[in-house]
Amino acid sequence: PNGGLMKAVARAWFWRGAETLGSMAAKPAARLLDEMDFLAVVLASAGLIVRGQWRFLFGHTVQQIYFTAVQRAYLFTVVGSIIGALMAFPLIVFRIHDPALLGRIMHIMMYHQLNPILAALFVTGLSGSAITAELGEIKANQAIDHLAAMGVDPHGFFVLPRLLGMILSLPILTCWLNVGVTVGAAAMLDIYQNVPLPIFLGVCASGLSYPSLALTGAMVVTQAIHIILVQSSRAFRVRAYVDIPRALPGAFAQSFVGCLIVSLLFSLIRYG
């Protein structure tokens, strides 16, 4: 009897564990489907915008680009310079002097891998969290419901300008981060490795190709779309002010993990 009881308990624990693992595996797919549904609603809302609202949409998109990309260009350049200097020290320790190899390392490790991830991380923490808090407050004020009652689509009014602004802003910030990283690494290599600055900059620029830039650009745009969809959809689920602080950590984590997955998928396409 005891043996049969132990087998029944073990069987119950096994099926409970399998059910838990199955639900955990299904969560990413469910979130992806929710994201695609939200994107479809946002894109469909663009077709509902009347002629008089396009001027507002354009102005709000430009405003988003200014707050996200223009105001933070200096910050991204300075941070990129520090990251580039830190990245150069392992190359100095391993005494890598070949400029062609140094340029190759910059392309593979920084331009197409680490820098887009860092740019997405910074934008998610700075602009993404601000968007979640802003839209969450609007949702808690029931302003979104009032606009919907007036016949104004909240997805086209609130989400679409931020989506367009992020699609244009994140590639700009990634470029500024690349510039800072290149300058910081070049300065350290010039001081410690006697690698001339013009030669290093030349090999970094010469290794860039249109296919690689297009693939990296597509990756950054995909990350930008993912960030806005996650942050906005989380904000639209807010019901009261107390829900806003609870939504911020989850939105940040989901956005950044999704950006890592996007980077991994594009790396498999690039190198696989």
Task: Describe these PLM feature segments.
Residues A69, A73, T77, F158-G180, ...:
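Selective transmembrane-helix segments that form parts of the transport pathway or gating/packing helices
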Residues P90-L114, W176-V221, L229-G250, R270-G272:
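Membrane-interfacial helix-loop-helix connectors in multipass membrane proteins
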Residues L135-L160, I244:
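Short cytoplasmic-facing helical segments at TM-TM junctions of multi-pass membrane proteins
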Residues Y66-L118, F122:
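Active-site cofactor/substrate anionic-group-binding motifs, chiefly glycine-
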Residues K7-H60:
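Short, membrane-interfacial amphipathic segments enriched in basic
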Residues L121-K139:
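A hydrophobic alpha-helix feature that marks transmembrane segments and, especially
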Residues R51-V62, Y66-V78, F256-V257:
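Membrane-interface helix starts
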Residues I244, G250-L268:
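Final/C-terminal transmembrane alpha-helix of multipass membrane proteins
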